[in-house]
């Protein structure tokens, strides 16, 4: 029987492991650091800290032993905070099954290197492209854990590998599509977090749907510009991993990035938001790396630039809005 190991027992790791268990094709093992969460999953079929009140598939088992989880896994799915990936991979590398395909559920760009998550995996584990896949799309973890209808994109340069993973996680409520454009799929997932911060700020300032629509649309434009400059297919960004993920993340109160931005827009400082939420949204962490990539490739990303200025340079949201709205007038067409 095919085995899928999911490393990371947070909300998304747990929800995706449950999707695979519900699909019923593979043995599914979830690894987590915290013994109390692992015990709750195994005995009560619930992750009380991250997905309280949701009953998980009893076929899903959990362990604190990463070597046990990874042993013989055909697919090793990673769902940890993006900026911890490199450190975790170094610790796990010796337990990696020689034939496993490593799958990233993470949506971020590594600070310091500006590498996508699949690039970090390739570098640390020295794996070829056909053994690395990514899964992305409009995937709010709690909705999926509640078994509400959802879609996603499985991307790998080797289409057959993507198809194999697609079959393992297809269920009555979860419909994955395949793609070979790993660059486009990953960038769509990473940049949308930054745009969601901007949308959240606008909501926090009391602005309405016109402002949100403008930020989402122009945010998509700058995402496409960067992705194409890095070798992606622009059509990927019109799909689930681009527009779909962007709309979900910018629209939902379940989105950590939108929520973070909303609190900032309502008058809180970045430090106050971090203290209240006890976490830093991934878009905050990745925004500087995304802006570095943009500048290195001569890509204009005014919304991302404004987000970085607010998050790291203390620019008040009202001034960021003024700077954005005061830019020189341009025609609306691709690449401008």
From Swiss-Prot:
Q: What class of enzyme is it?
A: oxidoreductase
Q: Which residues form the active site?
A: 192
Keywords recorded for this protein, A-Z: Cytoplasm, Lipid biosynthesis, Lipid metabolism, NAD, NADP, Nucleotide-binding, Oxidoreductase, Phospholipid biosynthesis, Phospholipid metabolism
Q: Name one GO cellular component term.
A: cytosol
Q: InterPro entries per the record?
A: 6-PGluconate_DH-like_C_sf, 6PGD_dom2, G3P_DH_NAD-dep, G3P_DH_NAD-dep_C, G3P_DH_NAD-dep_N, NAD(P)-bd_dom_sf
List GO BP terms, alphabetically: carbohydrate metabolic process; glycerol-3-phosphate biosynthetic process; glycerol-3-phosphate catabolic process; glycerophospholipid metabolic process; phospholipid biosynthetic process
One Pfam family for this entry, by name?
Answer: NAD_Gly3P_dh_N
Q: Give the reactions, separated by semicolons, that this protein catalyses.
A: sn-glycerol 3-phosphate + NAD(+) = dihydroxyacetone phosphate + NADH + H(+); sn-glycerol 3-phosphate + NADP(+) = dihydroxyacetone phosphate + NADPH + H(+)
Question: What is the similarity comment for this entry?
Answer: Belongs to the NAD-dependent glycerol-3-phosphate dehydrogenase family.
Q: What does this protein do?
A: Catalyzes the reduction of the glycolytic intermediate dihydroxyacetone phosphate (DHAP) to sn-glycerol 3-phosphate (G3P), the key precursor for phospholipid synthesis.
Q: What is this protein called?
A: Glycerol-3-phosphate dehydrogenase [NAD(P)+]
Q: Which organism is it from?
A: Thermobifida fusca (strain YX)
What gene is this protein translated from? Answer: gpsA
